[in-house]
Protein backbone atom coordinates (compact mmCIF):
# COMPACT_ATOMS: atom_id res chain seq x y z
CA UNK A 1 0.00 0.00 0.00
CA UNK A 2 1.22 3.51 -0.86
CA UNK A 3 0.32 5.39 2.28
CA UNK A 4 3.03 8.01 1.80
CA UNK A 5 1.92 8.66 -1.77
CA UNK A 6 -1.71 8.93 -0.70
CA UNK A 7 -0.88 11.48 1.99
CA UNK A 8 1.25 13.51 -0.41
CA UNK A 9 -1.55 13.56 -3.00
CA UNK A 10 -3.99 14.84 -0.38
Curated annotation (Swiss-Prot):
<comment type="similarity">
    <text>Belongs to the 14-3-3 family.</text>
</comment>
<protein>
    <recommendedName>
        <fullName>14-3-3-like protein 3</fullName>
    </recommendedName>
</protein>
Amino acid sequence: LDVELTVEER
